Amino acid sequence: MSQQGISLDLDLQIAVDNPRLPTQAEFETWVRAAIGQTKPVVELTIRIVDIAESQQLNSTYRGKDKPTNVLSFPFEAPPEVELPLLGDLVICAPVVEQEAIEQNKPLIAHWAHMVIHGSLHLLGYDHIIDEEADEMESLETQLVEGLGFDNPYKEA
């Protein structure tokens, strides 16, 4: 199955006034890259938010009272229930923009990285333990470079 063979239902919610957001098609391309061959049918929501909403969600769900670039909320169904729902990503547009500036990266490349990073979290990847972090970063780098962008972890 190719990436294009994946049935993707992406609910893109824009809750911030920002004319420099990626297109629906770009978000779909990045999700498809991250999902790869793992699932033939996928449903997920990506919500683009402002600083206040990101900070509130980060405080509520992670105990960190500050905004963050991406939050991942995997859908957890009982083992006997098979649903294509992968989960939700919440991405803070102002944080992504600021990070791109600080890291001297093209904004579109950083958006791609954040969508891939969040999607991998929805698939169960994590970066709390060094070994898992290395695996996740390696996969992120491979996927981002496969889309024609530079290694997101390379020092600018």
From Swiss-Prot:
Q: From the record, give the cysteines joined by S-S bonds.
A: none
Binding, Zn(2+) = 117, 121, 127
Q: In the UniProt record, does the keyword rRNA processing occur?
A: yes
Q: What does this protein do?
A: Single strand-specific metallo-endoribonuclease involved in late-stage 70S ribosome quality control and in maturation of the 3' terminus of the 16S rRNA.
Q: What is its EC number?
A: 3.1.-.-
Quote the InterPro entries the UniProt record gives.
MetalPrtase_cat_dom_sf_prd, YbeY, YbeY_CS
**Superkingdom:** Bacteria
Q: Which GO terms describe its molecular function?
A: metalloendopeptidase activity; RNA endonuclease activity; zinc ion binding
**A Gene Ontology biological process annotation?**
rRNA processing
Q: Which Gene3D superfamilies match?
A: Metalloproteases ('zincins'), catalytic domain
Q: Which gene encodes it?
A: ybeY
Keywords on record: Cytoplasm, Endonuclease, Hydrolase, Metal-binding, Nuclease, Ribosome biogenesis, rRNA processing, Zinc
Q: Which organism is it from?
A: Shewanella frigidimarina (strain NCIMB 400)
Q: GO CC terms for this protein?
A: cytoplasm
The cofactors it requires, by name, are: Zn(2+)
PANTHER family xref list: ENDORIBONUCLEASE YBEY, CHLOROPLASTIC
Of which family is this protein a member?
Belongs to the endoribonuclease YbeY family.
Query: Which protein is depicted?
Result: Endoribonuclease YbeY
How are cofactors bound according to the entry's free-text note?
A: Binds 1 zinc ion.
